[in-house]
């Protein structure tokens, strides 16, 4: 039903399509499936060739966070149209509810051909939970958290329903305070191919655990002599984490050129 591996160089159409608003979410949503043994390809909106790919997952980075709401919706429409025929269709949503979520969800839903929208923004492993339709970050409503002060993409509401257009019929919001709770809810939903799945990495984990269309063997863990950590976020928590790494004697911190210009003594 979902296609299968033909040989080492050819697959039928991919199994899972992901429409993402930035590169991080394009990779993050793919990761739980990759850990299950599926392969993923992350690409830009155009051109997307489903015929040439040998991956089970196609994740399209729309790079729409920095766009206007209209352009973000247009990018989501284009990406969804390219992936709409795949068995599983997913739309990433930031777990702190930043970005043009309402516009992108409507655009993707209208283009997807799906009859239902399942919206699950919780990512319990990162402290992002959904309780009574309200999104929390470490117990604080997201619109009252530091994410509401994001200079470019502030979280303007904590109420998940505010992000679903009235034009979308059959939408369901999933509350979850733990990953196990989210997994259980996702597992109970039938006909997954009729659903546009919208959410954060927590939803991806649940889908990979309960709805993975093929049972592949997890890949062997990779080993490395050294570890590269790249911090490219403006979030204060990321800055604190980078500062802690910089203070370790075993770590070498290479700063961005602009920061090196401010402080030439730093590497």
Residue ranges and their predicted role:
Residues 9-16, 39-43, 56, 69-73, ...:
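Cap/lid and interdomain-hinge subdomains that line or gate substrate/regulatory clefts
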Residues 134-266:
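Conserved, well-structured core segments that form the ligand-binding/active-site neighborhood
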Residues 1-5:
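Short, Lys/Arg-enriched N-terminal segments with co-localized hydrophobic residues
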Residues 53-63:
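A structural-propensity feature for long, helix-poor, extended segments
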Residues 48-50, 124-128, 203-206:
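Short gly/pro/ser/thr-enriched loop/turn and capping motifs at secondary-structure boundaries
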Residues 30-38, 46-47:
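Residues that scaffold, gate, or flank divalent-cation-dependent active/transport sites
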Residues 26-29, 100-101, 206, 238-239:
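Short glycine/serine/threonine-rich phosphate/pyrophosphate-binding segments
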